[in-house]
Curated annotation (Swiss-Prot):
Name by which UniProt lists this protein: Probable Brix domain-containing ribosomal biogenesis protein
GO MF terms held by the record: rRNA primary transcript binding
Lineage: Archaea, Methanobacteriati, Methanobacteriota, Thermococci, Thermococcales
PROSITE patterns: BRIX
Keyword hit for Cell cycle: no
Organism: Pyrococcus abyssi (strain GE5 / Orsay)
Amino acid sequence: MMLITTSHRPTRRTRSFGHDLERVFPNSLYMTRGKKTIQELLMEAYDRGYERLLIINVWKGNPLKMTFIKVHPDDWGYLGYLYLHGVKLQREMGFRGLNPIREDMPLVVTTAKRVGLDHLAFAQVFSELTTGKFVPRGDKSLLSIADKYNTDVLAVIERHPRGIVVNFYRLDVTKERAVGPLINVKIWIMEDGRRWDYKEAFGIKVKPRRKEGEAEEGARKDSH
């Protein structure tokens, strides 16, 4: 499925997030970045038979951005980006030491039962980014969807006051609740031009940034 790594000099929390993703993306691997360049990571992913390279970027100690790159020797390219409000790790949801899934099974991407068009659109985008299988939820239970597609792992797109969240289920671990990680997405951008921003979607006004000259003038006035 994918090779998962981080930007250079990741924090412990970011490494933990990478390991958590390894446990919910079937047949995937988390690898310490070290000094590897993007090209070296792409070759590593290609040699291992992966279709995607995922790089987790850090800001102030926390995962900030997930960059998805298509793996192909002649046609590699950036696919899209998720900008995050934050994440909740598996250990913070009560699950420690889960084993990665080392067998072929699809990652099924679906939604909670009552969501809006934004959630449906993002579910399709997330399946494209991860090579997962998008399945419209309707009135079906997660168990029935998993049985139909012969999988133990589902990514469920859910509502959140500050954006959209992705929550992961491992039915081989528990059928009662999500195991995580929980990913809170505030912005997603695809290279083909599709995008979504929670502030725009929720009608939140963003204060315009002052131009450099205006900022300097304001600073001079404040100093008097």
